[in-house]
Amino acid sequence: MSKLYGYRRYQPRTQPKYDFPFYASTAKRHPTKPLVIVPQTLSEVTGPVFGHDDVKPTDHDLTRQHAGEPIGERIIVSGRVLDESGRPVPHALVEVWQANAAGRYPHKADQHDAPLDPNFSGAGRTVTDAQGHYRFITIRPGEYPWRNHYNAWRPAHIHFSLFGRAFLTRLVTQMYFPGDPLLTLDPMYMSIPDEKARRRLVSQFDLQNTVPEHALAYRFDIVLRGRAATPMER
């Protein structure tokens, strides 16, 4: 029988702290007992993840899901999904969700006093190509207030969910935008101790993929597990 190779563990200080005093909700939901490391079995290392037939060719374009154009700055977000050894991850499911240009989510729990956009649902999905590339067309999300502390605002961000080759490469994370002054004030972003690891969550302006008179582009590469792993969301 061939040897079962497990995944490398994350580097210390590169993932968000389970209990971060400045991020209030972690106090109630973080583990209260020491974590137990369990061996990786065949089902976790090679297990199936999703059905590719669920993804439509146009699901990557969040600006074409309704009859009209959504309000806001149109942007392109693209990048590559890589494994812990730097190899492309083909046929990986990439899903995104976000607030609209006014900083409002369409779900009922969002009570932010900002307008909804009937032409923007704020969610999309795609599958990486043979070289691990993905691409979304969307609207730049707005910042919004949250009640973590006095005058708290979340920086503009896009949520990402990825399914790699197996269950252990599952990742939920957030992408931020370069130059945002709210980043250093945001407890979620700052809960990652290592500064270099935090910067992995910040996209880069991408002139090469910017479409003249149509949309600015941002690049966001994602690494599933390993020493250079993209930090997860907690």
Where are these regions (language model features)?
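Beta-strand-dominated extracellular/periplasmic modules and repeats
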Residues: 1-234
